Amino acid sequence: METQLYIGIMSGTSMDGADAVLIRMDGGKWLGAEGHAFTPYPDRLRRKLLDLQDTGTDELHRSRMLSQELSRLYAQTVGELLNKQNLAPSDITALGCHGQTVRHAPEHGYSVQLADLPLLAELTQIFTVGDFRSRDLAAGGQGAPLVPAFHEALFRDDRETRAVLNIGGIANISVLPPDAPAFGFDTGPGNMLMDAWMQAHWQLPYDKNGAKAAQGNILPQLLDRLLAHPYFAQPHPKSTGRELFALNWLETYLDGGENRYDVLRTLSRFTAQTVFDAVSHAAADARQMYICGGGIRNPVLMADLAECFGTRVSLHSTAELNLDPQWVEAAAFAWMAACWVNRIPGSPHKATGASKPCILGAGYYY
């Protein structure tokens, strides 16, 4: 039997742009990732998406128009990837598209990801799978995180418990025991608060190389107040997003006189400390943690993680397991599309709390 090619598209809570990754499968067996393309969000698009995070007028119309705009950008990204790899749409078995999350409310049984999936199928001329979270929510799950099943398929070791940390806008961990099902949950903010602080105080999308945070000092009292949020004491399964940890939440803990560099530095330690606390509680026997996502490019955050974990847990990039840390999430949704095509349940129900494993997503022919 010939192997199959799939493409995954991911745009996360950082809202910086869309990643597309090409993977090769043999039925349900992973063979590797072969290519990547990235399209940054124009500032105007990003602002409109952020505006939709809060309740406002004409939300239905705005969400549908943004779904179409996003799908055109996704199609452009897929086209660039195909050109890079010298492939035609007919070479691709399926396209897995996560969409752009604008609301995540598992307590109400829904999570909203913007994407016009039929339009994306039409524009790319590729069979498209999307709306991955709804099936898990229908089975009583949180709808997030979905990546632990993918991490388990690729990164599990039969000899030891491993942890996989994804640092996007939200940080989440997957715990991969050698002899039990994988599980995971959102640990709390990843880059999201740091990015929001950068945008508010420097008009920059993020802290490149941690350069601004490196000039600040940790504010212990502020850190303690942030760590007291009740989310961190909740048992897993659990998931979160901008609904809980937005800039206006942070500002309720500030008196206005703080040095902006110090607040940014404190937010880095806040992310690292919440990750450490989560891993210490849920994966006390893990000695190796593999890191992916945009946060791995922030040396201040990586130093904070190293300081929190000390010699207890060894920190690595997923590149050491043959998958670029910037490719992991998009590759996961390509893998989920392959699961859909092969009728394989791809949901990490032990992570989300769903009542059973489910085949995730809905498919659209062009």
Swiss-Prot record:
A UniProt-annotated Pfam family: AnmK
Annotated EC: 2.7.1.170
Enzyme class: transferase
Residues at which ATP binds: G12, T13, S14, M15, D16, G17, A18, D19
Keywords attached to this entry: ATP-binding, Carbohydrate metabolism, Kinase, Nucleotide-binding, Transferase
InterPro entries (alphabetical): Anhydro_N_Ac-Mur_kinase, ATPase_NBD
Reactions this protein catalyses: 1,6-anhydro-N-acetyl-beta-muramate + ATP + H2O = N-acetyl-D-muramate 6-phosphate + ADP + H(+)
Molecular function terms from GO: ATP binding; kinase activity; phosphotransferase activity, alcohol group as acceptor
HAMAP family xref list: AnhMurNAc_kinase
Task of the protein: Catalyzes the specific phosphorylation of 1,6-anhydro-N-acetylmuramic acid (anhMurNAc) with the simultaneous cleavage of the 1,6-anhydro ring, generating MurNAc-6-P. Is required for the utilization of anhMurNAc either imported from the medium or derived from its own cell wall murein, and thus plays a role in cell wall recycling.
Protein family membership: Belongs to the anhydro-N-acetylmuramic acid kinase family.
Matches recorded under NCBIfam families: PRK09585.1-3 (NF007139)
Annotated protein name in UniProt: Anhydro-N-acetylmuramic acid kinase
UniProt source species: Neisseria meningitidis serogroup C (strain 053442)
Lineage, opening ranks: Bacteria, Pseudomonadati, Pseudomonadota, Betaproteobacteria, Neisseriales
